[in-house]
Amino acid sequence: LAAPTKSEQWIKGVEVVVHLAAKVGIVGSYQEFFDSNVLATRKLLEKAKKNGVQRFIYASSPSVAHTGNALIGVGVHKAEPAHVRGSYSRTKALAEIDVLAAHSPDFSTMALRPHLVWGPGDTQLIERIVARARSGRLFLIDGGYSLIDTTYVTNAAQAFACAIDAPTSAFNRALMVTNGEPRTVRETLGRIAYAAGAKAPSRSIPFHIAMAAGHAAESAWRIRKSEPPLTSFLVEQLATAHWFDLGETKRFLEWSPSISLDQGFADLAMWYAKA
């Protein structure tokens, strides 16, 4: 993202660009997120069109349309940069808007929104959940009964592969990518912990207390310039239902998840057993 000369070298002679890179998390100034997620995407779009790229597939996020309300069996809502939470979501929303606006008869664009991608070797979601479970710091919010969608990594990769060869009618739109198997937060966290040989979370705290703690942690860790152990966004994600309708994705990409959550959890357990 920070090396425009290299990115142009990579683009020359290719027909399809799949743009996955982004600045994630909450640490950093808004400008840092904007530069990495918005400006870099705009430059990549410009270079792609200049070098004759035919298709541009952007890895977006469901958070670009999540304004705090529960999302229950919904399709794709439009990106809402003015109303979403945090610099990451806001800048990803702006970038998605730019990508779809760049669509033309000679330059097909698409945004895929994979939700909570996980699998063996994951250093983001899985590693953090397991570390907290092993240290006894993994907890539930309001019992952990909200339903959420997640995406096994193989299914996410296959969705992007299908997008590369998708019919032209599939482009000029955003599409959701998940396993299509909503489970409670309690079950999801518990099975991840169990796969790693750790105890499932049993402690639960009320939403309002967790949210206050999240805001306090954000303020304290902002001074340290490091990732806080809890954020208001994470609290919201753990306490709010968010699962989606995959009808359009399956139809336009001719794709469906090939690895079930149960198989994914089994594969995760096997990976930890060998680690």
Regions found by a protein language model. Give the residues of each.
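A conserved pocket-lining segment of Rossmann-fold NAD(P)-dependent short-chain dehydrogenase/reductase
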Residues: 79-82, 109, 131-151, 155, ...
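Active-site Tyr-X1-5-Lys
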Residues: 83-113
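Glycine/proline-rich active-site loop of Rossmann-fold NAD(P)-dependent oxidoreductases
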Residues: 93, 106, 118-128, 154, ...
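Conserved C-terminal active-site "lid" loop/helix of NAD(P)H-dependent oxidoreductases
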Residues: 153, 190, 213-256
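Mid/C-terminal beta-alpha module of Rossmann-like enzyme folds, strongest
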Residues: 166-229, 262-269
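Amphipathic terminal alpha-helices
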Residues: 244-252, 256-275
